[in-house]
């Protein structure tokens, strides 16, 4: 129904139309009025649908732009991946041409060579009690 018009107002309008138009032409007038209202509603629906299409198209344009931006960022990502692959290829080629040998393993220091018995200090002197010094004399 129309906003702000209740049943009593419609009844009053109907009575006024009956008096002004007359009972003979009132049904034809009501039918024409109904057809006009139907056409008006169809036009309003088409108008609303056109606005909805424009809004939907605007949203689609935004989505297309976002997709295009994502594709461009994916292009940059794929370019970075390609660059990393080329770098790996170059590094492997350089390593084949000039291999880097690992540093030689650290060797533990060699144990001291055994000295000949004449040059070596007496091994027994470390464990043996001190001998008497002939220069000092034996004062035991």
Swiss-Prot record:
Part of the twin-arginine translocation (Tat) system that transports large folded proteins containing a characteristic twin-arginine motif in their signal peptide across membranes. Together with TatC, TatB is part of a receptor directly interacting with Tat signal peptides. TatB may form an oligomeric binding site that transiently accommodates folded Tat precursor proteins before their translocation. It is a single-pass membrane protein. Residues 90-140 are annotated as: Disordered. It comes from the Bacteria. Keywords: Cell inner membrane, Cell membrane, Membrane, Protein transport, Translocation, Transmembrane, Transmembrane helix, Transport. The Tat system comprises two distinct complexes: a TatABC complex, containing multiple copies of TatA, TatB and TatC subunits, and a separate TatA complex, containing only TatA subunits. Substrates initially bind to the TatABC complex, which probably triggers association of the separate TatA complex to form the active translocon. This is Sec-independent protein translocase protein TatB. It comes from Hyphomonas neptunium (strain ATCC 15444).
């Amino acid at each position: 129904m129309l906003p702000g018009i209740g049943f009593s107002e419609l009844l009053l309008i109907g009575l006024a139309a009956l008096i002004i138009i007359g009972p003979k032409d009132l049904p034809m007038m009501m039918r024409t009025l109904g057809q006009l209202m139907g056409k008006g509603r169809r036009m309003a629906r088409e108008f609303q649908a056109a606005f909805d299409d424009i809004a939907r198209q605007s949203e689609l344009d935004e989505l297309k732009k976002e997709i295009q931006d994502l594709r461009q960022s994916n292009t940059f990502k794929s370019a970075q991946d390609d660059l990393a692959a080329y770098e790996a290829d170059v590094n492997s080629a350089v390593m084949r041409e000039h291999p880097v040998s690992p540093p030689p393993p650290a060797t533990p220091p060699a144990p001291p060579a055994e000295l000949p018995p004449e040059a070596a200090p007496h091994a027994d002197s470390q464990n043996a009690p001190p001998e008497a010094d002939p220069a000092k004399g034996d004062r035991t």
